[in-house]
C-alpha cells in the first residue's frame, strides 16, 4: 500500500533536512557539538574570572579603616592604660577582616595623614581641659568636624568622653550624642549589672555581665535626654547600649572627683543610667560613647571586651558578626605594652 504523495514528499523533506543538519560544511554533528562545548567552556571560565575579580575589588573597597588614638600615660599602674588598651583592641580586631585597624600612641599624631580616608576615629585618653581634641585653639575640633561632615564615625572612651562644656560640649553632642560634664555628671567606682540589651549590632553575642569600673553616669546628652531610652533628637538617632540603675549608696557617693554627693544625682534615685550609647547622624556617620575603661584588667572580661569591639566595628560601618566579635586574651597579652609607671 503506497502512502499518499503529500505524505511521501513530507517524509523526504524531513530526511533531507535531518541529513543536512548532520553534515554542514563537511562537519558532522559531533564536530559541531564539540566545538560549541569548547566555546562555552571558554566563555564560562572568562565569566568566572570577571566575577571573581569584581568580587575582589568590591571586597577591597569594603575594607574599613579604623584609627584608635591613645592618650598619654596617666594614673597609677593598670589604670588609664590607653596605649596598651588600643594595642590590645587592635589585636582583637584582627579577627574581623573587613576592618583595618591602626593606632596612635601617646596623644595626637605627629603626622595627621593617618586620618586621611579613615572611616572611624576613636579617642581613648584623658579628657577635660587636657583633651587632645581641644588643643591648638580649636584647629583640631575643626578637623574632626570635617570628618563628621563626610560621615566619619567618631567614638570616645572613658575620660575621653569628658570635655569642658564651653570648649567642645556642642561638638561632642553633635558627633557622639553627649559628653561628661564636670559637676553635672559623676564618676563613682561601682559594679553595675548589665542584664538586658537592645537589639542592635553592638550587642550581638553579648551576654549579661557585672563588672567594677569607674562608670560615669548622668551624662549631658543631646537635647537633655535622660539617655536610658532610644530616641530621635534633632538629626540624631540615639540608642542606649549599656544601662543599669545605680543604688542609692552609689548616688550618695563618694565619687572619684569631686567626691560629692551632688543633690541632683541623689534626687534621681532609681533612674536607670546609660553608660554606653550609640548614635546615627544625619551626615551618615555614627558615634558612640563608653564611660568604662578605667581599669585595664577589665579587658579580660569577655563580655566587656566584646561590646566595645562590636562598637568599634559598627562605628566603622563594617558588619558586626552574628555572634559578635570573637577574641581571646592571655595574661601575657593583657600585660603587654603597659606604660612604665612608678608603683603607688
For each feature predicted by the language model, list its residue ranges.
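Short, Lys/Arg-enriched N-terminal segments with co-localized hydrophobic residues
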Residues: 18-36
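Bacterial N-terminal signal peptides
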Residues: 44-54
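Extracellular ligand-binding/catalytic regions of CAZymes and related secreted enzymes
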Residues: 61-64, 70, 85-91, 95, ...
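Short alpha-beta junction capping motif
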Residues: 66-70, 115-166, 290
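Glycine- and acidic-residue-enriched helix-capping/strand-helix junction motifs
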Residues: 73-87
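A short, well-structured beta->alpha microelement
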Residues: 97-110
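An acidic, glycine-rich "communication" segment
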Residues: 156-256, 324-344
Amino acid at each position: 500500500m503506497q502512502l499518499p504523495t503529500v505524505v511521501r514528499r513530507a517524509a523526504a523533506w524531513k530526511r533531507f533536512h535531518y541529513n543536512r543538519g548532520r553534515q554542514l560544511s563537511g562537519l558532522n554533528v559531533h564536530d559541531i557539538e564539540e566545538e560549541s562545548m569548547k566555546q562555552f567552556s571558554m566563555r564560562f571560565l572568562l565569566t568566572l574570572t570577571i566575577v571573581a575579580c569584581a568580587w575582589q575589588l568590591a571586597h577591597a573597597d569594603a575594607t574599613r579603616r579604623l584609627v584608635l588614638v591613645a592618650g598619654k600615660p596617666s594614673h597609677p599602674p593598670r589604670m588609664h592604660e590607653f596605649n596598651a588598651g588600643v594595642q590590645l583592641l587592635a589585636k582583637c580586631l584582627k579577627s574581623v577582616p573587613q576592618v583595618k585597624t591602626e593606632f596612635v600612641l601617646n596623644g595626637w599624631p605627629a603626622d595627621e595623614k593617618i586620618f586621611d580616608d579613615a572611616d572611624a576615629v576613636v579617642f581613648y585618653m584623658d579628657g577635660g581641659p587636657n583633651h587632645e581634641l581641644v588643643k591648638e585653639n580649636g584647629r583640631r575640633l575643626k578637623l574632626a568636624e570635617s570628618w563628621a561632615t563626610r560621615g566619619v564615625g567618631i567614638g570616645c572612651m572613658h575620660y575621653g568622653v569628658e570635655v569642658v562644656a564651653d570648649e567642645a560640649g556642642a561638638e561632642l553632642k553633635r558627633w557622639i550624642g553627649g559628653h561628661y560634664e564636670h559637676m553635672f555628671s559623676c564618676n563613682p567606682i561601682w559594679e553595675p549589672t548589665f542584664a538586658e540589651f537592645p537589639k542592635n549590632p553592638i550587642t550581638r553575642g553579648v551576654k549579661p555581665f557585672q563588672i567594677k569600673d569607674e562608670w560615669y553616669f548622668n551624662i549631658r546628652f543631646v537635647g537633655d535626654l535622660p539617655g536610658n531610652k532610644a530616641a530621635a533628637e534633632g538629626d540624631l538617632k540615639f540608642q542606649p547600649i549599656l544601662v543599669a540603675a545605680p543604688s542609692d549608696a552609689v548616688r550618695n557617693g563618694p565619687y572619684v572627683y569631686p567626691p560629692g554627693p551632688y543633690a541632683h544625682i541623689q534626687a534621681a534615685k532609681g533612674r536607670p543610667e546609660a553608660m554606653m550609647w550609640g548614635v546615627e547622624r544625619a551626615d551618615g556617620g555614627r558615634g558612640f560613647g563608653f564611660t568604662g575603661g578605667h581599669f585595664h584588667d577589665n579587658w579580660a572580661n569577655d563580655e566587656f571586651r566584646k561590646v566595645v569591639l562590636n562598637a568599634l566595628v559598627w562605628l566603622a560601618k563594617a558588619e558586626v558578626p552574628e555572634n559578635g566579635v570573637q577574641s581571646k586574651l592571655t595574661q601575657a597579652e593583657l600585660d603587654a605594652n603597659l606604660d612604665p609607671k612608678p608603683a603607688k
